[in-house]
């Protein structure tokens, strides 16, 4: 079996930090991510957030495909709230973060941001986009809500 190839738009994830800390993941802006105005198309920030959440869970040992196959459940996005602050442009390196804001029995609310990775002249890493993404755990066959498996909650709460 061939090892999976990384998505060409991603860089290696920064090692995760646990127990409410923030996971950081780097992504480069490619031509396909931009619109006719030369800035990142607004919906692509949701893709960047999704990839960061997936890499964060993977860093915690939570592989979503394996869970679907072996446990029969999966996370689905149930709501998004996004605010855009500044545009990103072609070839920018972005630092995308994920942090648990709230954990319920069947859902998690994740606080996410995208910032320019390279600081500006004043040393700031400008905030480009921020959002709260709610994901729910569902039975993969019926798509009905279920409690998040304890092993996942344990991974989220384990000390670093």
Regions from the language model: what does each represent?
Residues 45-48, 76, 134:
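Residue-level recognition of specific faces of alpha-helices
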